[in-house]
Amino acid sequence: MKNCLNICLPVLFAVFAVALARGQNDQNEIQITRPVSSLGNTRPIPVSIEGFDSEVTAILKFDLYVQGFTFVSPETAQYQISGSSTGSVVGRVVDRFGKKTLFSRSYNGATLRRQAHALTDDIVFAITGKKGIAQTQIAFKVQASNGNGEIYIADFDGHNYQAVTHDGTIVSAPAWAPGRSALYYNSYKRGNPDIFYHNLTTGERDDIAHYTGSNISPAVSPDGSRVAMVMSESGSPNVWVANANGSHPRKLTSTSEDSSPCWSPDGQWICFATKIHERRVLAKVPAGGGEVQVIRTPGTPNPTEPDWSPDGKWIAFTMQAGEFDICVMPADGSAPPVILVRGEDPSWSPNSRTLIYARRTGGHYVLSLLDVYTKQVKDIHQILGSDSEPAWAR
Amino acid sequence: MKMMKLVYPMTLVLAVTLAATGCRNHKPVGVTPIPNGQGGQVGELPPGGTMGGNQPGGGQQANMQEFENMTEDRAALANYTIHFAFDSSAIRHSEDANLQSVASALSSDPSTKLLIEGNCDERGTEEYNRALGERRALAARQALAKLGVDPARIRTLSYGKDKPTDPGHDESAWSQNRRDDFVLLHPKTGA
């Protein structure tokens, strides 16, 4: 009760002060409104697409849909995209309202598919001023029904996939080394859950964590210099940080049920799932060591598998409450999380608005994309088996 | 009078604010420092955990080497698998008899070691389950230590939800899958 008064009085004063200030200026009563979602509800940008063959049209539509565009007739489009794809791709974008051509360009390159992706990146940049994601890559795991699997990489839309491992063992949690063509992942190849570093160019790999217990869930710092992981060598699974080659591992937490570390884009914090005071929560700890701080997720219990957007603004995570739902909240805690779509294990694209995640269907996983502002979702091109644990290269 | 018009809505706003935030949570949203009683400070690996981290294939902890060159005997302790409640790594009393049997097997042959494999049902996310399986294996190791087994003879690993014994999608299957399997390890004989 004493605590109540400690808040009530200052709040009352503050509210009263605001009321007085406002009362000076307008005659209206103060409205009580429900808090608006911090993500808002952005309407997709309407564009038209004409002149390309069906495969190129499909690629343009896929790329643009998951970045918040929708497709209408030329007469009602805000931007008109036209061109051709005989031989190579030629594309042109006209701003219908402004009555001007944003660009007109021809592309050459290995395949029509690559050219089409280059075109959509130019379209996104010309219209939004932001870099597009059509030429980015993902890593994920493909799992067979016996539990064994392999690590794969692919274009962000699931095409041009290739297996990175051929070990016929259990693998999980691929994570890109930023700025390098390399992956970290967990593999049971040596009879224990270990973390490997795998150079994709040379094919060489080292295990960088082979301690007793389970070495799982690698997450690489944004500058590529350090790797966070969950290790249980000390007797309970905790968050550890080591240099990129695995040297000098340091235990960062003593909380009891840690999993899924991820880094803030400034490299200062590691966010992870844990259990504090009997409640499952998200938390963050300074990457150099320090106090663990809870990140509250009001309205979304049992948060897990967080991922911090590259622009620093958002944390996406999985809520486990019977089903699994992808949620997004402001990283500064200034608004509660928003529940977006059924699914698990989100990973942010470099554009900080498209998420890739896994959703369960018929006993296996498929990978899907979500634009968090327009809420548009689309499955990517699926590979055989169960595809899950996606990681978007940044 | 402008002030009179405002008092009623202000009281309402105050009431709503209090109801929404509750009186207990008077810290700013998002930041609650946790006193890290066991030491939030950064800790190095304990002595004996030296690794050649800078060498290719480095990072092998001494303990792991002690478990190499052993053969796995899955049959010996197959009947003593212990099971867990949903989302829990707590050892239930119903499992005491099985743990005692495992402890007896280990004490009857001091040359043996033990591998505990922790598993989960499918109702968790993948990395959460991988950590939960590990906690289940560690809990059994702790329980065996209380029964007199030297924990240095035991290593743990987690399969998360990757190795269910029952592929079904109901509680009957799930309860079978939430388990620790015990694998007896014998030193390899011969030259």
What do the PLM-derived regions correspond to, one by one?
Chain A
Residues 131, 142-150, 168, 186-195, ...:
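A flexible loop/linker signature enriched in serine peptidases of the S9 family
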Residues 8-17:
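Bacterial N-terminal signal peptides
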Residues 155-172, 198-216, 242-257, 285-302, ...:
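Multi-bladed beta-propeller domains
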Residues 76-122:
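Amphipathic beta-strand/beta-sheet edge segments enriched in Tyr/Trp
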Residues 132-134, 178-179, 222-223, 265-266, ...:
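Residue-level detector of Asp-centered blade-edge/turn motifs that repeat once per structural unit
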Residues 138, 183, 224-228, 267-271, ...:
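Hydrophobic beta-strand positions that form the internal "hydrophobic ladder"
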Residues 22-62:
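A structural "domain/chain start" motif
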